[in-house]
Amino acid sequence: MIKLKPAPILNLGAPGSGKTTALVTILADPDLKLIYLSTDPNGEQSLLHALTEVYKIPEAQWKNRIFAHTVEPGAADWDTLLQVSETISLKNYQGLAQESGIEKAGFRQYIELINVCKNFTCSWTGTRLGDLTFVPPGHVLAFDGLSGLSTMARDLSIGAKPSLHEGEWNVAMNTVERF
C-alpha cells in the first residue's frame, strides 16, 4: 500500500478575503479535526463567526473538533510610545539606527509562540495536543497569521525601536524562516 503524505497548502489572500472562513470547510470531512493557531487578534472571533454565522454549523458538530490558540503580537504601552516619540524627536535616522532596541523585554511574543507550538493547549477547551512538530493523524494544522509572525520576529529583534537597520532586518527574516 502506498503511504500518502498530506499536502501542505498555503492559503493566501488580502485581509478580509475569507482565508479563515475557508478553514471551516475542513470540517466537511467528519474524520478531520482542526488545530487553529493564530497570530491575528481577531482570528478566533473570525473562525467562530464562520462556524456560527456563515456556515451555521451547530456547536455540537464542531465543539470537539476544533482546537484553537492565539498569540497576538506585542503592543507598546503609553510609556513606551512616549519613550519612542522622545527618541525620534531627538535623533536623526543614523542615531535611531544605532539604538540597540527599545523595551525589548515587552516584545517576547515570538518566544511564547514557540512554546505554544512545543506544547499546544487549546484555549477553548484546555485540551493538550502537545508538540505540533508532529500533527496527530486526522488533524489539520492551520497557522493563521504570517503577518503576525513577521511582526513578532521583528519585535524580538528590536522591541519598539522605530527603525531597523539591514542587520536587524536580516535577523528578523532569518527568525521567520527558521519558524
Per-segment meaning from a language model:
Residues 130-179:
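P-loop NTPase motor core
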Residues 2-122, 134-137, 148:
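Conserved P-loop
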Residues 125-126:
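Intrinsically disordered, low-complexity domain-flanking/linker segments in eukaryotic proteins
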